[in-house]
Amino acid sequence: MKPFPLVTLVAVSAMFFSSANAASLQVGDTAPVVSGITETGASLNLGDVYKKQPYTLVYFYPKADTPGCTKQGCALRDGNTELAKKGVAIVGVSADTVDAQKAFKEKYSFPFTLVADPDKTVIKAFGQTGNGLAKREAYLIKDGKIVYKDVGVTDQQANNVLKFLATQG
């Protein structure tokens, strides 16, 4: 009798995680036009950001000032000059508060905007569902469409985006 609850738990977990992954946006999808609150408390409409530069990199991370998220943010900080030369604006998003995002940005001198999304409006708009935290993903957007998706990468995020851009002519 005991194997049944375990089998049920595994089956339900598999459905949960596969449906969460299936909901995530893919290359070719229209990028969500949604607003969030920046680390300064200002409102930021991603649709406006998409129009300002040829590319926008919207990257998601689970929690500010944790090891993997710090590596990811610092890699993008360190690659920001090269990415900016390629016309890439960067926006980071997590479910953290405005104060947590502000402290994270200041501590690591991030030159890009961080969005505080505790109500998960932006996170959900990008199809990220699951345990209440953002999944570590990045979406490169051009002309309102997702042209590249980087999943789960931390310290190589900037390099991966630059490699993709090098293939775009």
Regions found by a protein language model. Name each.
Residues P3-V33:
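N-proximal helix/coil linker or "cap" segments that precede and/or mark the start of modular domains
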Residues L57-V58, I90:
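Hydrophobic beta-strand anchors of alpha/beta hydrolase catalytic cores
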Residues Y59-D65, A95:
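Aromatic-flanked redox-active Cys/Sec active sites in thiol-based oxidoreductases
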Residues T70-Y108, V122:
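Structural microenvironment flanking redox-active thiols in thiol-disulfide oxidoreductases
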